[in-house]
Amino acid sequence: MSATKLTRREQRARAQHFIDTLEGTAFPNSKRIYITGTHPGVRVPMREIQLSPTLIGGSKEQPQYEENEAIPVYDTSGPYGDPQIAINVQQGLAKLRQPWIDARGDTEELTVRSSDYTKARLADDGLDELRFSGVLTPKRAKAGRRVTQLHYARQGIITPEMEFIAIRENMGRERIRSEVLRHQHPGMSFGARLPENITAEFVRDEVAAGRAIIPANINHPESEPMIIGRNFLVKVNANIGNSAVTSSIEEEVEKLVWSTRWGADTVMDLSTGRYIHETREWILRNSPVPIGTVPIYQALEKVNGIAEDLTWEAFRDTLLEQAEQGVDYFTIHAGVLLRYVPMTAKRLTGIVSRGGSIMAKWCLSHHQENFLYQHFREICEICAAYDVSLSLGDGLRPGSIQDANDEAQFAELHTLGELTKIAWEYDVQVMIEGPGHVPMQMIRRNMTEELEHCHEAPFYTLGPLTTDIAPGYDHFTSGIGAAMIGWFGCAMLCYVTPKEHLGLPNKEDVKQGLITYKIAAHAADLAKGHPGAQIRDNAMSKARFEFRWEDQFNLALDPFTARAYHDETLPQESGKVAHFCSMCGPKFCSMKISQEVRDYAATQTIEMGMADMSENFRARGGEIYLRKEEA
């Protein structure tokens, strides 16, 4: 923890400086590469980690080296990871997908905003200083048309987004030639289909079947296409957002950029404080990854935080507002039904979901069914017009391991399965949210129940936390559960930071949560046997055995921390080529000893072979030349 806590003014000033000086930055010894597709404009970014050669022999004066292949890795940082791209947060990112959207000819620009709230914000001159200057003219589907990736997939259309994703998911592994790097243990996939090569047709088929989603609002053309599904790489979401008591627009944009740098595949803006609308505009215009929200939070702000005063009309206006800004997926707590609320009465921790508790309070105060459930078809009509995916929220998720897998949790899950089928009638993409707090032995049931009752729609879980005893370390307690459920088939993991249950995360907390969850997601990919998942591990192990310290740092998920820990005890440059580290020292390094054993064994094999040949020579009489019949 930092020794000096910054004041609010200092935090804002630091964030503003970050934004003002922001430029594309590569990780150490990495470079940005692009792989092109067949569709115009399909140019898929990846990060390529450059490695040093391996010393294989020769003398001190004339050493002999063997080259090591560069390792391509999935990169979520967008333009922020390319030093060749000029960054201007005031202008936003380039609109990568705009030509693809326009070419389909099924959208139209809106001459007037659909949301009354948006109209009021735009008319308020007092917000000019906060407003993003380059606001897009929003689009929506033409009358009678649907513009979702699910609709196109069902029509047999392979979109540029689908080709982009296919290239991205393969992670450039076709470039790797080394058998050492390509070696991979068989996985246990629990029924997942993991083809050796992911094609655009495979992507289309998975989306058409509802097993995967491509969150890609037509009003967020800055986003780089990505996919969430059991048969693809496990993804990670990062939550950001201001509150009524802390954070600013500058800090949230900083956290967005920071999140994409450290591997967030999507980002959820959970803002609940002032200027939600303006904050979200800045985030969307500068985000290369899909953005999700929980619209009920903002709807509640519009009725001064009084849950009983919520109305369908206020919520609908919020959906239109956010859809026309470009939000890629909505978390909707439509499965919290009136009859399920009493099921939570005997729980230790009741209803812990903010959205779930809001809707439960509304249902009880009006003694009516959840208006999100009642108006679900209208929600789907809105989503179909903008290609907003639905993330069906688990408002009754367990908030303690004592409450795990109870009647309320699974009753809601079954309702989410019913709602999934309704959304699919409108060609709306759907994923299902899951818990929560679940001990290890009870985790797998969550996945099997979801697959069965939600028709294999992608599962998206918060952890789950496997124990409740570690406030301040819940990124660890949940990372364990996240790795397990990712292995069982969960498609996306929502990160948990060290501040979970304690406070709003800052920039460093975001990084810690993301690194923890990237580890969990990667461990799940390895366990499933995802093709190519082991390449980076093999490269790291090879570098470690060969004492290529710089390569070890650069192959790490966090090169800076790896280097810092090494340099705490061996800061000299000579320490970067030493055949030991400070843990064991030069005399007891297991890998150095292992190398010596290997060299000794190889020498012994040669000497034994020479001895065998000598014995054979003497047995044949010691003649240099043998008679033809003896040869």
From Swiss-Prot:
Substrate binds at N239, M268, Y297, H333, S353, R354, G355, D394, G395, L396, R397, E433, Y460. Zn(2+) binds at H437, H501. It catalyses: 5-amino-1-(5-phospho-beta-D-ribosyl)imidazole + S-adenosyl-L-methionine = 4-amino-2-methyl-5-(phosphooxymethyl)pyrimidine + CO + 5'-deoxyadenosine + formate + L-methionine + 3 H(+). Signal peptide: none annotated. GO terms for molecular function: 4 iron, 4 sulfur cluster binding; carbon-carbon lyase activity; zinc ion binding. It comes from the Bacteria. Pathway: Cofactor biosynthesis; thiamine diphosphate biosynthesis. Its EC number is 4.1.99.17. Binds 1 [4Fe-4S] cluster per subunit. The cluster is coordinated with 3 cysteines and an exchangeable S-adenosyl-L-methionine. Its cofactor is [4Fe-4S] cluster. Transmembrane segments: none annotated. Catalyzes the synthesis of the hydroxymethylpyrimidine phosphate (HMP-P) moiety of thiamine from aminoimidazole ribotide (AIR) in a radical S-adenosyl-L-methionine (SAM)-dependent reaction. This is Phosphomethylpyrimidine synthase. It comes from Escherichia coli (strain 55989 / EAEC).
